[in-house]
From Swiss-Prot:
The protein's assembly and partners: Homotetramer; dimer of dimers.
Catalytic activity: L-aspartate 4-semialdehyde + pyruvate = (2S,4S)-4-hydroxy-2,3,4,5-tetrahydrodipicolinate + H2O + H(+)
Record organism: Syntrophotalea carbinolica (strain DSM 2380 / NBRC 103641 / GraBd1) (Pelobacter carbinolicus)
Disulfide links within the chain: none
Gene3D superfamilies: Aldolase class I
Pathway where this protein functions: Amino-acid biosynthesis; L-lysine biosynthesis via DAP pathway; (S)-tetrahydrodipicolinate from L-aspartate: step 3/4
Keywords: Amino-acid biosynthesis, Cytoplasm, Diaminopimelate biosynthesis, Lyase, Lysine biosynthesis, Schiff base
Lineage summary: Bacteria, Pseudomonadati, Thermodesulfobacteriota, Desulfuromonadia, Desulfuromonadales
Name of the protein in question: 4-hydroxy-tetrahydrodipicolinate synthase
């Protein structure tokens, strides 16, 4: 279910900082119309860290309603408190999400045994397909391949979004547990090499603004058209880099705003791009024909 070209969709806000439901619904339609296979609300790119519980539920509920079963919805429900993650995952299930994306505990930096028990507790308590999310650059700790492999045997654990940047780690999971768990790229730069090793797709940032091209590359890999996939991959590199010119999701939200897809409103502590980075972003977007020079 959670394979292919998946988007870590942005959460639009209005000028007063409120969730912009109307624009969010349009963004979802834009994604589905351009071939995106799965919508992932309330992830890192969706600024989930600045949403309160009511807003979190509202974003997921709106997403499920607008998608209307056209594609699966993988709802971000992670927390560094296990009880809170269980609560958020239960809420997502009640609202009709097809699965939950669960970031590994951040800030409190548990041991590998603690990480294992955290995810096992969620999987034991909520009968919903769950995709683990390993992103050491955000959480301050790496979930090892061994820990992921231990969790892969749980019937509710169906995937892992691997954003460690370590192809050896991803390959180890695929080699030892690929028949039990789908390994999904969490880094647009590494989607092609990870899929070449047996990964099942990407949860993409870049797909927010160029979903058709991300889908085309994933499709090319799945159809063993590696020359085509390589061409698309190399063509997208500058755009991938531009999406991380500053902290995600600032560049991608600004890019989407420049393209007229949404406003560029962020919530503190995220702020606007530095002027020189904004100029660089505009140059890249213009080069791809996404905005006028």
């Amino acid at each position: 279910m959670f394979t292919g070209s998946m988007v870590a969709i942005i959460t639009p806000f209005d000028r007063e900082g409120r969730f912009d439901e109307e624009t969010f619904r349009k963004l979802i339609d834009f994604q589905i119309e351009n071939g995106t296979d799965v919508i992932v609300p309330c992830g890192t790119t969706g600024e989930s860290a600045t949403l309160d519980h009511a807003e979190h539920k509202k974003v997921i509920k709106t997403c499920i309603e607008q998608v209307n079963k056209r594609v699966p919805v993988l709802a971000g429900t992670g927390s560094n408190a296990t009880s809170e993650a269980i609560e958020l995952t239960r809420d997502a299930k009640k609202m009709g999400a097809d699965g939950a994306l669960l970031i590994s505990p951040y800030y409190n930096k548990p041991s590998q045994e603690g990480v294992y028990r955290h995810f096992k507790a969620i999987a034991d308590n909520v009968a919903l397909p769950q995709v683990l999310y390993n992103v050491p650059g955000r959480t301050g700790m790496n979930m090892t391949a061994a820990t992921t492999i231990r969790l892969a045997s749980h019937p509710n654990v169906v995937g892992i979004k691997e954003a460690s940047g370590d192809l050896t780690q991803a390959s180890t999971i695929i080699a030892e547990a690929g028949d039990q768990i789908n390994v999904i790229s969490g880094d647009d730069f590494l989607t092609l090499p990870m899929m070449a090793c047996g990964g099942k797709g990407v949860i993409s940032v870049t797909a927010n603004i160029l979903p058709g091209e991300v889908k085309a590359m994933v499709t090319a890999v799945n159809e063993n058209r590696y020359a085509d996939a390589k061409k698309i991959h190399l063509n997208l590199l500058n755009l991938h880099q531009a999406m991380f010119i500053e902290t995600n999701p600032v560049p991608v939200k600004v890019a989407a705003a420049l393209m007229g897809l949404c406003g560029d409103h962020l919530r503190l502590p995220l702020v606007e791009l530095l002027p020189e980075n904004l100029a660089s972003l505009k140059k890249v977007l213009s080069g791809y024909g996404l905005i006028q020079a």
